[in-house]
Amino acid sequence: MAVLSKRSMKPSGFQRTREVKLGDVVEFEYELPEPLKNSKDIANWNLPINKQKWTIPSEILTQLQYEELDIEEATDYLVQIMDWRINGYWFYNHGNIEYLTGDHFFYLAFWRIDGVIPYWKDSDATFFYIERYCQLKKDCYGWMQVTNRRDGKTGKATSIIYNRITLNYNANGGIQSKTLKDGKVIFGKLVKSWQKLPPYLQPEDSGDTNPSQILKFVEPAKRSSKGGKKVYKEVLNSQIDYLSAVDNAYDGSKLKYYYDDEYGKTTEVDVLERWNIVRECLVQGRNIVGKSLHTTTAEEMEDKGGQAAKNLWDESDIHEAVKLGRDMTISGLLRWFKPATHGLEGFIDSYGYSIVEDPKKPILGIDGAMIEIGSKSYISKERLGKSGSTLAGEKRKYPLTIDEAFIEEGKLSPFDIIKLNEQLSHCGTLSNKTVKGNFVWIDRESKQVGWQPTETGRWSVLWMPPVDERNKLVADRRGYKPI
């Protein structure tokens, strides 16, 4: 009789509360559901630890298998699938208990990206955990992400918008990208993934097998015979479309879900101004009725688009919102920066965990290759010997901090762009409030001067050096001069 391995995590050991950090600072915390109390209800419980990993559940049926079920069996099956799509799924992964949100389960079990089956990895789990948290949080319109290139953000986003819209009646999903052409590409990817779904996951639609602008979940148009009575099917009356990048494209619409693709590369409009219009499509009175996801890669942020993206990022600072006494951020969004070290292709073990630090011995990767160094060492080595705009470009491609993600490449600058950006980052940490006051003598003999704040002061000071760095001077033939 199979038993749970002694080395496997017990449900009581599952960490429900997780932190989202920006550097060393906690941005916010989220809580995951309580795991199933009986270990035997968690998938893979009966497997040896080295065999425990994510695989599509054997309960998932092909369309042919589904059609062989009787009505009662088919109903029970769809109810189970619906439960997993909404409430999620639990499985053992190399001894650890892992939770898939409903959106994550749908993505892994059913969504195909260019015909490829996605695999589970820890950085994607965090992505979907944040998505779930924002879905449940009342005073939140959604969230924004900055990540490295080739992170699979488009596949995850299109999967989420499809899952959300097809679980609701009279729900509209909208997509915008940096241009109309790019929006069409994103929509085209969604359509291709939709076409690969088994028909039992394709709600009644308008009949267009390859829609180019809008995917409508409505009854196909048909003519009734003269004098005949039309009979209508029960349909979702929901839809997913994409529109041009202009700021008022969705003005006046009601959206259940909105996807903003590559907001950091959008130059046709100011993405912050566009978001201020779109967010009204997600609210009814004072109630938030829709959510949004905003993603961009750090590499190749356009000058104008990068600055607008930075403004949107800054307005999504929860700590600043708390200081102001607000219930939500100024933008209404939360934010997450994923360092390039996490989820980096080539540095993910066979169970889906990121190999950030150098392993003691080579580890088998999920791609079948051996991993001999961690992603942190790899990225550091790629930067060796590079400087100026070349190094800046490398940092933007694989950023380790949010400052590196927003670094200005400075291709036309004659100065060291890295040093300039370091100074910009430092200046950004300073208060922008000056203090009025006067410089007064503490001791004329030793030439010691102090600072006395007063509203009627003659001088305005933005920053003062540490006390032990003040009043440093040397005497020369002309008197005294500062060091």
Language model: regions and residue ranges:
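Walker A/P-loop
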Residues: 138-161
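Conserved nucleotide-binding/hydrolysis micro-motifs of P-loop NTPases
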Residues: 180-182, 298-302, 342-345
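Conserved Walker A/P-loop ATP-binding site and its immediately adjacent core
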Residues: 171-193
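Short, conserved "post-DEAD/DEAH" coupling segment immediately C-terminal to helicase motif II
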Residues: 269-288
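Post-Walker A helix-loop "phosphate-sensing" segment adjacent to the P-loop in P-loop NTPases
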Residues: 164-171
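N-terminal accessory segments
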Residues: 1-141, 189-193, 200, 210, ...
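Structural recognition of the conserved hydrophobic beta-strand(s) that form the central parallel beta-sheet
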Residues: 241-242, 288-297
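RNase H-like, metal-dependent nuclease domains and their acidic two-metal-ion catalytic environment used
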Residues: 2-8, 12-16, 30, 142, ...
